[in-house]
């Protein structure tokens, strides 16, 4: 192999290392696990179990607090697995905290996110409100279909109980819920940092401690982009975004980790040394033994074992998984209108499954299948799998209702 080919391979590895860190710390931890937690807490504190919005959102909070608590013990804590296996090391949570300062809840709605990232443009004639600039973009194509199904379901459901904006504005529980989700009633939040000599973190909404009950997203509560929660449209978009984050977004960033990154040379998470310069022994090694140079540069054996073991667990579906379009409580409501709306949602998701399967058979859509012959199924809802048995373990498909792993 020519040395320039080795340099190019190393360059791609450095990019992948940084992308791996962004994926784990931002796309996964921050943008799903961390930001959803204040909504979980506010829902349980401010909305009675008979409140229609509590019934709407409850399935999408299943086991989230439990898995987040475990994450703080072994993943995001000082000297935890994140610090051990991703390139920022001890700065991992600092990076998440810094990025959180510019986080925008409304931009996590998929159509808005795609436009912000330059992957779509506003298009009033499209049923999704946007048109894709890259048509063969499986995450966006499948995601917009799922997003639309979620938003249609939420809209129909909410309008059963809120026939006008005045009714919504007069709902004391709902307004208290939204206020708690945003406002810091007691404390100003301190951004994540180590306490001198302790190795422990003090942090914002990413590491909720004793003040969690009164915090929510308090440190960014004054941002002008927050919905005011005065219209049905705002409620529908807010609940749709919460459900999207908890279900489809988390499925897309989590359950493909082992299938796509289980072979560490293909997806290194740490770089052990900088790009070799001409005249150095590292450059000579790149010339004479490129494979050895590559292995010496990327994630170590111990870090690889820990990292692969971790994503193997994270990428696995449990046998009791409850997928989008399913309810684990058959008698979740006695309202026939709500039941009919949910059944329409379920059938819509099953239709999306068929569309995804057909697209994955289309040879012209190369990004869906690729040279590796690995079809994109991360946003395949798996609604039709009534007992979840066919999707147990590492399947790289299925959208669970909630962030439970």
Each model region followed by its residue ranges:
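Long, compositionally biased charged/polar stretches
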Residues: 1-405
């Amino acid at each position: 192999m020519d040395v320039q080919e080795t340099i190019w391979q190393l360059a791609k590895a450095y990019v992948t290392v940084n992308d791996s860190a962004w994926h784990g710390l931002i796309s996964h931890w921050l943008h799903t696990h961390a930001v959803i937690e204040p909504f979980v807490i506010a829902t349980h504190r401010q909305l009675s179990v008979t409140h229609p919005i509590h019934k709407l959102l409850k399935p999408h909070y299943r086991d989230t607090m439990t898995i987040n608590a475990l994450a703080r013990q072994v993943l995001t804590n000082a000297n935890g697995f994140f610090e051990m296996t991703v390139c920022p090391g001890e700065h991992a949570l600092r990076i998440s905290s810094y990025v959180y300062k510019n986080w925008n809840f409304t931009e996590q709605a998929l159509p808005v996110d795609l436009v912000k990232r330059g992957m779509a443009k506003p298009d009033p004639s499209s049923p999704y409100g946007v048109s894709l600039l890259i048509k063969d973009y499986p995450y966006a194509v499948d995601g917009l279909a799922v997003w639309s199904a979620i938003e249609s379901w939420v809209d129909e459901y909410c309008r059963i109980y809120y026939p006008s904006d005045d009714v919504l504005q007069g709902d004391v529980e709902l307004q208290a819920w939204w206020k708690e989700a945003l406002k810091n009633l007691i404390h100003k939040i301190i951004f994540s940092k180590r306490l001198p000599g302790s190795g422990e973190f003090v942090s914002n909404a990413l590491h909720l401690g004793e003040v969690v009950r009164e915090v929510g997203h308090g440190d960014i509560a004054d941002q002008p982009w927050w919905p005011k929660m005065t219209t049905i449209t705002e409620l529908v978009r807010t609940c749709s975004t919460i459900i999207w984050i908890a279900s489809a977004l988390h499925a897309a960033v989590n359950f493909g980790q082992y299938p796509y990154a289980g072979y560490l040379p293909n997806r290194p998470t740490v770089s052990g040394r900088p790009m070799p310069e001409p005249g150095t022994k590292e450059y000579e090694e790149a010339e004479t033994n490129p494979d050895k140079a590559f292995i010496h540069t990327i994630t170590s054996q111990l870090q690889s074992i820990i990292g692969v073991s971790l994503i193997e667990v994270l990428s696995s579906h449990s046998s009791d998984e409850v997928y989008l379009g399913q309810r684990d409580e058959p008698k979740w409501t006695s309202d026939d209108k709500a039941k009919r709306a949910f059944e329409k949602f379920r059938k819509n998701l099953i239709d999306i499954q068929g569309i995804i399967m057909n697209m994955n058979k289309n040879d012209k859509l190369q990004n869906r299948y690729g040279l590796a012959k690995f079809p994109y199924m991360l946003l395949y809802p798996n609604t039709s799998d009534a007992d979840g048995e066919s999707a147990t373990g590492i399947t790289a498909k299925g959208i669970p209702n909630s962030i439970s792993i």
